[in-house]
């Protein structure tokens, strides 16, 4: 099966780089799934996005993403995020607390983190 080269990079660090069979996320135009050999595009991610990376023979990788862009070429996907956290790095209680914040940016970050944990859609 064909693979995508996927790079997820936040302002402060590289989050993940590797091979995937499918990438799913939410953009300002709606939800999108990327398979190998997808048409090229550039899309803006929503502020409370979750990126799901499906990998052959491995568990899905879930990343909470706070804003940024996605670039798709025939061979791969690059996610350039303002903030990003792997599911394994997220504290559920803190994410829930943040999602209820009066500050819109903090609330969006909390929702993205809860999506990565699979606790909200």
Curated annotation (Swiss-Prot):
KW Ion transport (keyword) present: yes
Cross-referenced SUPFAM superfamilies: Epsilon subunit of F1F0-ATP synthase N-terminal domain (SSF51344)
Highest taxon above the source species: Bacteria
A Pfam family matched in the record: ATP-synt_DE_N
Coiled-coil features, chain-numbered ranges: none
GO MF annotations, alphabetized: ATP binding; proton-transporting ATP synthase activity, rotational mechanism
Membrane-topology annotation of the record: Peripheral membrane protein
Chief location category: membrane
Keywords: ATP synthesis, Cell membrane, CF(1), Hydrogen ion transport, Ion transport, Membrane, Transport
GO cellular component terms given for this protein: plasma membrane; proton-transporting ATP synthase complex
InterPro entries per UniProt: ATP_synth_F1_dsu/esu, ATP_synth_F1_dsu/esu_N, ATPsynth_dsu/esu_N
Cell compartment(s), UniProt: Cell membrane
Subunit structure: F-type ATPases have 2 components, CF(1) - the catalytic core - and CF(0) - the membrane proton channel. CF(1) has five subunits: alpha(3), beta(3), gamma(1), delta(1), epsilon(1). CF(0) has three main subunits: a, b and c.
HAMAP family found in the cross-reference section: ATP_synth_epsil_bac
Function recorded in the entry: Produces ATP from ADP in the presence of a proton gradient across the membrane.
Entry-linked NCBIfam families: ATP_synt_epsi, PRK13442.1
Similarity comment text for this entry: Belongs to the ATPase epsilon chain family.
Protein name: ATP synthase epsilon chain
Organism field: Mycobacterium sp. (strain KMS)
Underlying gene: atpC
């Amino acid at each position: 099966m064909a693979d995508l080269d996927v790079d997820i990079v936040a302002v402060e660090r590289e989050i993940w780089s590797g091979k995937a069979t499918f990438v799913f996320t939410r953009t300002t135009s709606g939800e999108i799934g990327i398979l190998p050999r997808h048409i090229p595009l550039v899309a803006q991610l929503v502020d409370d996005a979750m990126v799901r990376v499906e990998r052959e023979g491995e568990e899905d990788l879930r990343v909470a993403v706070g804003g940024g862009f996605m670039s798709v070429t025939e061979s791969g996907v690059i996610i350039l995020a303002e903030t990003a956290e792997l599911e394994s790095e997220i504290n559920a209680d803190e994410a829930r607390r943040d999602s209820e914040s009066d500050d819109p940016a903090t609330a969006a970050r909390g929702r993205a983190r809860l999506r990565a944990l699979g606790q909200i859609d």
